[in-house]
């Protein structure tokens, strides 16, 4: 069961993977949810905002009732501003969708929600979603480390651009994804339109909280070794 804290969904994916597909689903459709969406930049989304709720932080209310803003400060300050706008305007915020940059490892961002007291008090991680580019993933993983990190930390994986590759290549991509992360659910975005239930209310992150604890332990061990402690 989720607590009274506001659930947070993190969306990751390498450059051009198709995160915008999921974000536009939230910002453009009449789904009845009040979701605060923190994105990289408005230019990639191409949505029309309705009301300016906070000029300084550039927080907008969309036609479907969702809030949208870009990450101009650190995560905690941005979400404090969203909560302030929520209280001042009497707006519901059912959940938060946080888009990482294409080159970001989602693990440190997830750790921030756990380790920063304000965020841990008001928010709870629901799931980390990663979008995988079926056409370019095999090439990307041989030249960059981030795509594998994004897949490895995912609670759920959305495969994009399946229609752009043949079945043999797609099978190789799935095998590679599974070798990196054998536990995450995989959904093909080309098989059917994504629905809100595919993205939210999954309650998957704390089912695998162990990964965060292991990362924290590893970080502490590396610090001790660097300082000459045992």
Language model: regions and residue ranges:
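C-terminal accessory "lid"/substrate-recognition subdomains
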Residues: 156, 165-230
């Amino acid at each position: 069961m989720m607590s009274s804290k506001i659930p947070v969904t993190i969306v990751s994916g390498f450059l051009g993977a198709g995160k915008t597909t999921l974000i536009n689903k939230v910002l453009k459709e009449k789904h009845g949810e009040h979701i605060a969406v923190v994105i990289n930049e408005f230019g990639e989304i191409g949505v029309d905002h309705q009301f300016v709720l906070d000029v300084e932080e550039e927080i907008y209310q969309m036609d479907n009732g969702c809030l949208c803003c870009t990450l101009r400060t650190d995560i905690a300050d941005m979400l404090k501003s969203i909560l302030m706008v929520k209280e001042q305007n009497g707006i519901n915020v059912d959940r938060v969708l946080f888009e990482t940059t294409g080159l970001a490892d989602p693990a440190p961002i997830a750790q921030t929600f756990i380790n920063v007291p304000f965020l841990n008090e008001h928010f709870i991680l629901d799931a980390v979603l990663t979008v995988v580019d079926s056409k370019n993933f095999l090439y990307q993983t041989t030249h960059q480390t981030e795509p594998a990190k994004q897949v490895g930390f995912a609670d759920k994986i959305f495969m994009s651009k399946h229609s752009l590759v043949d079945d043999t290549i797609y099978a190789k991509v799935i095998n590679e994804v599974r070798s990196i992360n054998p536990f995450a659910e995989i959904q093909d975005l080309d098989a059917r339109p994504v629905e809100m239930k595919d993205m939210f209310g999954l309650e998957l992150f704390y089912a695998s909280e162990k990964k965060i604890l292991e990362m924290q332990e590893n970080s502490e061990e590396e610090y001790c070794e660097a300082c000459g402690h045992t």
